[in-house]
From Swiss-Prot:
The lineage of its organism: Eukaryota, Metazoa, Chordata, Craniata, Vertebrata. Residues 1-66 are annotated as: Interaction with AKAP13. The active site is at residue 118. This is Nucleoside diphosphate kinase B. Major role in the synthesis of nucleoside triphosphates other than ATP. The ATP gamma phosphate is transferred to the NDP beta phosphate via a ping-pong mechanism, using a phosphorylated active-site intermediate. Negatively regulates Rho activity by interacting with AKAP13/LBC. Acts as a transcriptional activator of the MYC gene; binds DNA non-specifically. Binds to both single-stranded guanine- and cytosine-rich strands within the nuclease hypersensitive element (NHE) III(1) region of the MYC gene promoter. Does not bind to duplex NHE III(1). The gene is NME2. InterPro entries: NDK-like_dom, NDK-like_dom_sf, Nucleoside_diP_kinase, Nucleoside_diP_kinase_AS. GO terms for molecular function: ATP binding; DNA binding; G-quadruplex DNA binding; metal ion binding; nucleoside diphosphate kinase activity; protein histidine kinase activity. Its main location: cytoplasm. It holds the Pfam family NDK. Its cofactor is Mg(2+). Its EC number is 2.7.4.6, 2.7.13.3.
Amino acid sequence: MAHQERTFIAIKPDGVQRGLVGDIVKRFEQKGFRLVAMKFLRASEDLLKEHYIDLKDRPFYPGLVKYMHSGPVVAMVWEGLNVVKTGRMMLGETNPADSKPGTIRGDFCIQVGRNIIHGSDSVKSAEKEISLWFKPEELVDYKSCAFDWIYE
């Protein structure tokens, strides 16, 4: 069995407010990825500042933190073969205008400042983000009954 990796996916306040949570979760499930953790929360400013620490010197950073704090988010951990890379492909480009139809951003959003979803950009980032948003005991380990139908 090939190596299973994990990624962090967060549905942003605009995705929650627009009622897109179910559609997004469905896409990851239909692809064959396994949900390991999920929580619905209003993220604290401290958590968001730490999450986006790499962007702190960018001019849009304060607005990004304010926007992410403006409403609830759905934080998730997904697991599967190449889930980081494949998950990013499923999301589409950061700027929805550059996203292809069939991707989450290509289908559901218009502007970069309201692009409805975040996904880890590397395995290393995923590990950092997962540990920031979830305690180890919140990650549920189980074997999906569909596992043998998805993986050789």
